[in-house]
Design a protein with these regions (language model features):
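Primarily the dimerization/phosphotransfer
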Residues: 11
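Nucleotide/phosphate-binding catalytic cleft detector across ATP-hydrolyzing
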Residues: 1-8, 16-113
Length: 113
């Protein structure tokens, strides 16, 4: 079984794709990109539009990479779990990010801190 996880933080967006086989977890891909989602959130209480766009663009690339891995591994799809932390939790407009990622087929969970 293959799994993918996306972690959207205040500064970075990370991807981890693993294969679980016979009880052993094998890392296939690990990516990290600087997205600076949290710029200005502490002062304004909102996510900036350009920061949301950077995250959406990054997650879109990650989804394409996950689809390519699924094809290589000859599986129809790989489930993607996505979480967001502090900046999304603190922003009044985090729902906009959640909605934009949902359009990509990624359901984002904003986790408590």
């Amino acid at each position: 079984m293959l799994y993918a996880a996306i972690d959207i933080g205040t500064v970075t967006c990370r991807l981890l794709v693993c294969k679980l086989e016979r009880g052993i977890l094998q890392e296939l891909v690990r990516e990290c990109r600087i997205v600076n989602l949290g710029i200005g959130v502490s002062k304004t209480g909102v996510l900036q539009e350009d920061a949301i766009e950077r995250v959406v663009s990054c997650v879109k690339e990650y989804c394409e990479l996950v689809r390519a891995i699924a094809q290589k591994e000859e599986v129809p799809s790989i489930p993607i779990g996505a979480v967001a932390t502090s900046a999304s939790r603190d922003a009044r407009n985090a729902g906009k990010l959640v909605s934009r990622l949902h359009e990509l087929g990624v359901d984002l969970l904003v986790i408590a801190g």
